[in-house]
């Protein structure tokens, strides 16, 4: 009875962990999709520079392909683990454990690789100044994608230019910065701010923002936290799966052992009862012979007297 209660408890815990797998995997996919616009625009602005290489090394190899593949696979694995737990299927549970172990090793290797790449990122602040060369094509019809990338980055990161908003006046033929540099954006806001109040423009350059982006954004920190949480949950799930496998395997062997023991006990009891039944006639005959011998001896002694 106690073993059955333990099995129920283990199954409930595995249900909860599989639910966590689904929730965390969906969260990772959502955050990765959220980061896609950031990464696409950053790569557009940093094309053919050392900054682009740093962005690719920091984000793309692990954050997008590997994490997305692992999370999609975890959703499927969680479903099979749930089915194995419901049906108490030893084969499904063993496959579930092995798959979790392989995924955990892949995640661990990716984490180590990412840490080494972050240490090796060769970007310095001086490299950010080279981004000014990408400003000269802003607003040209054939470079609409670059114009969109600059506007998106300046709006999202609340910055203007590379070092300062005057970079737009130095590197282009514009008389004032783009409207995306305005704190409160509306058509013609940049011209109005440039003529009346410069405080209505973002004062910080985008170079520092991009450098901070390479050091790690909130989205990247969230992904790292989710990755660590998934790893810890996988360890717990593997421990519980091994325990459940042992309990189910023991339960399947235990009834046979009990049956054999009961058969042996029944056989021994039957043999003992049968032996007693067989011994009863013999004992009665011995008692009769003993009585007859005693009576004969008594009769013989009386004749001698």
From Swiss-Prot:
Segments on the Cytoplasmic side according to the record's topology features: 1-12, 246-305
InterPro entries found in the cross-reference section: Tetraspanin/Peripherin, Tetraspanin_animals, Tetraspanin_CS, Tetraspanin_EC2_sf
Changes after translation: Palmitoylated; required for interaction with ADAM10. The precise position of palmitoylated residues is unclear and occurs either on Cys-9, Cys-12 and/or Cys-83.
Keyword set, alphabetical order: Angiogenesis, Cell membrane, Lipoprotein, Membrane, Palmitate, Transmembrane, Transmembrane helix
Membrane topology of the entry: Multi-pass membrane protein
Gene3D superfamilies: Tetraspanin
Disulfide bonds: none
TM segment ranges: 13-33, 60-80, 90-110, 225-245
Swiss-Prot/TrEMBL GO biological process terms: angiogenesis; cell surface receptor signaling pathway; maintenance of blood-brain barrier; Norrin signaling pathway; regulation of angiogenesis; retina layer formation
Lipidation (S-palmitoyl cysteine): 9, 12, 83
Topology feature Extracellular, residues: 34-59, 111-224
Subcellular location: Cell membrane
A cellular component annotation (GO) from this entry: plasma membrane
Family statement: Belongs to the tetraspanin (TM4SF) family.
Self-association and partners: Component of a complex, at least composed of TSPAN12, FZD4 and norrin (NDP). Interacts (when palmitoylated) with ADAM10. Interacts with MMP14/MT1-MMP.
Stated role: Regulator of cell surface receptor signal transduction. Plays a central role in retinal vascularization by regulating norrin (NDP) signal transduction. Acts in concert with norrin (NDP) to promote FZD4 multimerization and subsequent activation of FZD4, leading to promote accumulation of beta-catenin (CTNNB1) and stimulate LEF/TCF-mediated transcriptional programs.
PANTHER family to which the protein is assigned, alphabetical: TETRASPANIN, TETRASPANIN-12
Protein name: Tetraspanin-12
Organism of provenance: Rattus norvegicus
Gene: Tspan12
